Amino acid sequence: MRVEIDSHSGFCFGVVRAISRAEEALQEQGEVFSLGDIVHNRVEVQRLERLGMHTVTHDQMPGLKGRSLFIRAHGEPPSTYRLAEELGIELIDATCPVVAKLQRRVVEAHEKMRQVGGQVVILGKRGHAEVIGLTGQVEAPTLVVETEEDLDQIDFTRPIYFLSQTTQSISLFQHLCDRCLLYTSPSPRDPKTSR
């Protein structure tokens, strides 16, 4: 049997960049702490652990005073950066540039929607590190939808700014946008009955 591996397969550039930054930090410092697994790949996490990377949670941050803490490609909310500063933790920020741009867009979206009484909606997986980082960019509530059924959370009488987690399907995002447009058309249909 012959197995071919697509030359374009593998980690996204944000994860490749984060792994490279982690390797550099490990080479310089010998030991680095990562806030959550650097990547959703057990083999790669174990390889980095053998080099001196330790995965920690937010609850363990107080014990890292004076040490280096790695922010993975998924990014973090501003509260994490503030806590690290308060605790004297040096951050190695490997937030993916695409995610960082999306974080800024979330802040801008909330400002625009605040002015018109609207709402910000993100297509994403609840509890995923990137989504936690996105929703944590502002104090105002952000709706997170995973499926068409979740559109029931949206108040279609108010303006909507719809964004997506970077790893979500473009076709699902477009489908949900189309459904939102249907519900907000001049004669909106009830989302519960027009699926």
Pin down the residues of each PLM region:
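Conserved small/polar residues in nucleotide/adenosyl-binding loops
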Residues: Y183-R189
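Active-site loop-to-helix "anion-binding N-cap" substructures in soluble metabolic enzymes
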Residues: R2-V138, T142-D155, S169-I170, H175-L181
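Active-site donor-nucleotide binding/catalytic segment of nucleotide-sugar enzymes
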Residues: R158-I170
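Short beta-strands and strand-loop turn motifs
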Residues: D6, L163-S164, S185
